[in-house]
Amino acid sequence: MRQATYRLATYNVEWFASLFDDEDQLILDDKPSGRYGVTRRAQAEALRQVFQALDADAILVVEAPNTGHQQRTVRALEHFAQFANLRTSAVAMGFANDTQQEIALLYDPAVLSARHTPQSSSDAPQFDGVFELDLDVDEQVDEVRFSKPPLELELTSKSGQVLHLIGAHLKSKAPHGARDADDVMRISIANRRKQLAQAIWLRRRMSWHLELGHDLLVMGDLNDGPGLDEYEALFGRSSVEIIMGEDLYDPHAQILCQPRARSLPSTARFFDRDNERYFGALLDYIMVSQRLRNAQPRWRIWHPFDEATIYRDAALRDALLLASDHFPVTLDVPATATLP
């Protein structure tokens, strides 16, 4: 751990589940991983290098290994931590799902503890439940569910500092299964509508924490950003803007909210096969409440090309490109028992 700071990270690891067998042991062979053109051995070794370089005290793993009939997320991540020789050897998770893409926290038990603390209220039920909202403005209540229920944790440092963390992976807006242009529009709008409902649900839980004066972090893959697609105009605001509101802060999201931003950050890099080119997107965030912001934490996107120090480190740069289609985001927070 860096002197007098905690480092928290969020990292979406593309198809982490494909690297483990039914006993949650890593498969280190030369067969394809879930990543296009990358073997399981190459992805695992790249992930080891990235996690070691992060040297974080806690890492929210989005698309964490599967929990199912035989497999267990906690056991798989513990095995990965041993393989990578990480000090983040403990794992916390909340509600499992059936997508093979879990949400879990790897953390250093010598630095902090993590406890699953799911909440429920009349206007924001527990995240594994059902949220009722009129999505279509047709005076009929729709039932909304999270395919990947957000992870609610209470983090307590050895010095007694308490942070509340919500880790999220919102619904993708991508029009999977579309057959033509009309399908693309219909599915995209339906997916955005559902994602916005998830954002409202999440925002209500956040407001509950903030009303109680909790120091709050909201992190993960929100699958959205201001101005990211043309359908946003139909709904007025992006999911990110709904979640962030006026009382949370993420400097990268703030840049996107500026009407004439010139240099746009990105946390993910995807390949457009139709046009044979890569494109970036800002999808991953670490939002903090006001007292945490006042402590002057430091954000960093571990982008292999945009970060000069990473670009000059060829081994780390290549590892980031092999490990996932997303890049980690870190937050260095002053390790003080009492925040300003």
What function would you assign to each model-found segment?
Residues 1, 67, 113-116, 144-146, ...:
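Metal-dependent phosphoester-hydrolase catalytic domains
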Residues 5-18, 32, 117-118, 162-175, ...:
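Active-site-proximal beta-strand elements of phosphoester/diester hydrolases
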Residues 11-12, 47-73, 106, 153, ...:
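Active-site beta-strand/loop signature of hydrolases that rely on acidic residues for catalysis
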Residues 19-38, 173-193:
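A solvent-exposed, charged loop/short amphipathic helix patch at secondary-structure junctions
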Residues 41-45, 139-155, 196-206:
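A Trp-anchored, charged/polar loop motif used as the substrate-binding/catalytic surface
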Residues 64-171:
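Structured beta-strand-rich core segments of catalytic domains in phosphoester-bond hydrolases
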